[in-house]
């Protein structure tokens, strides 16, 4: 990839449908802890459901999350997580293909897909972002790799351009 990230942690809030994919350098409890803490942002977690992997169990314990685990080796017992993973994978591939970017950009595309999906209104007229944060997303919803024209804010001329002028 573009970074040292070799793994990913996908998380889904079943109540709000909010999801995210965190590229991780390793499958360590520390990396999992940071991702889980960022995702929950201090919100109450009524149940943390996982596949029971050691790093997730350790991180959930450190965060004082009530835990439950699926049966090991039986993905059909964890259909919500498996479907979330499939959705993020398909959405990430679509963004990469649409942008014409190589697979190495997955570390940018996966989180970008999640933000775009999280801010899209559902059948009830509200987005998962709204159900989580109590207000709709205020930022621009731009797909990964789209062409943009950037206009920097006005700044004081420091004369640096004259320093580098070759004429």
Each predicted region: which residue ranges?
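Retroviral integrase
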Residues: 1-88, 132-167
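Charged alpha-helix within mobile-element recombinases
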Residues: 80-141
């Amino acid at each position: 990839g573009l970074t040292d990230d070799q793994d990913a942690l996908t998380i889904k809030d079943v109540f709000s449908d909010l999801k995210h994919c965190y590229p991780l350098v390793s499958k360590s409890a520390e990396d999992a802890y940071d991702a889980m803490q960022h995702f929950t942002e201090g919100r109450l977690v009524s149940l943390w459901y996982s596949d029971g992997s050691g790093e997730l169990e350790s991180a959930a314990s450190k965060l004082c999350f009530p835990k439950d685990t699926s049966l090991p080796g039986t993905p059909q017992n964890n259909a919500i997580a498996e479907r979330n993973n499939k959705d993020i994978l398909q959405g990430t591939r679509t963004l990469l293909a649409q942008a014409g970017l190589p697979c190495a950009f997955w570390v940018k595309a996966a989180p970008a897909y999640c933000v775009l999906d999280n801010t899209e209104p559902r059948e009830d007229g509200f987005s998962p972002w709204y159900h989580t944060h109590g207000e709709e997303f205020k930022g621009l919803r731009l797909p990964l790799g789209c062409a943009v024209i950037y206009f920097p804010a006005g700044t004081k001329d420091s004369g640096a351009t004259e320093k580098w002028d070759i004429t």
